[in-house]
């Protein structure tokens, strides 16, 4: 019989996140356990956030948004990663369960954005807005992020 939880030590924040995600996520995927506790060398709020993110990552329904983005490549022509990080930051505390996609190009981006409740697939100075799989309109200019946030709050 395997012993999965024999130690309770946090380690550094990032390594603690990785170890907790792998250990707790692995057990949950195997159907082991009905309660989780994440220990990190961080504020208790960060531990709770990590727990919710682990649950979300293994497919459990969790209140709040899930923000996805692409790893970016040579086709990326706008600040996709920065926008995704800012969207996630602005949605902290938002309780509606939605999947938000911020994709970096017009080649693969539209497919991923269609899979989300709301998403954008960007190009140079613009992004196509998708809501529930349908292209709705182009967002243009220097305030694509603000325009996108307005649309997120509408759904």
Where are these regions (language model features)?
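Active-site beta-loop-alpha junctions enriched in small/polar residues
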Residues: 7-12, 39-43, 73
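Conserved, mostly hydrophobic/aromatic
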Residues: 27, 70, 105, 113, ...
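Conserved alpha/beta-domain cores
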Residues: 14-29
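C-terminal helical cap(s) of enzyme catalytic domains, especially alpha/beta-barrels
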Residues: 42-61, 129-145
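Small-residue-enriched alpha-helical segments and adjacent helix-cap loops
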Residues: 7-8, 62-104
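Short, small-residue-biased leader/transition segments that mark boundaries at the very start
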Residues: 1-6
């Amino acid at each position: 019989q395997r012993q999965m939880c024999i130690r309770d030590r946090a380690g550094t924040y990032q390594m603690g996140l990785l170890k907790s995600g792998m250990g707790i996520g692995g057990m949950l995927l195997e159907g082991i356990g009905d309660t989780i506790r994440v220990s990190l060398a961080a504020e208790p709020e960060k531990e709770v956030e990590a727990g919710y993110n682990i649950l979300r990552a293994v497919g459990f329904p969790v209140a709040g948004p899930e923000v996805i983005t692409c790893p970016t490549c040579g086709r990326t022509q706008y600040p996709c990663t920065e926008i995704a990080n800012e969207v996630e930051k602005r949605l902290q505390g938002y309780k509606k369960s939605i999947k938000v996609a911020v994709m970096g190009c017009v080649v693969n981006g539209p497919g991923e954005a269609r899979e989300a409740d709301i998403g954008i697939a960007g190009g140079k100075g613009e992004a196509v807005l998708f809501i529930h799989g349908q292209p709705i309109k182009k967002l243009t200019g220097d305030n694509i992020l603000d325009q996108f946030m307005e649309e997120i709050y509408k759904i």
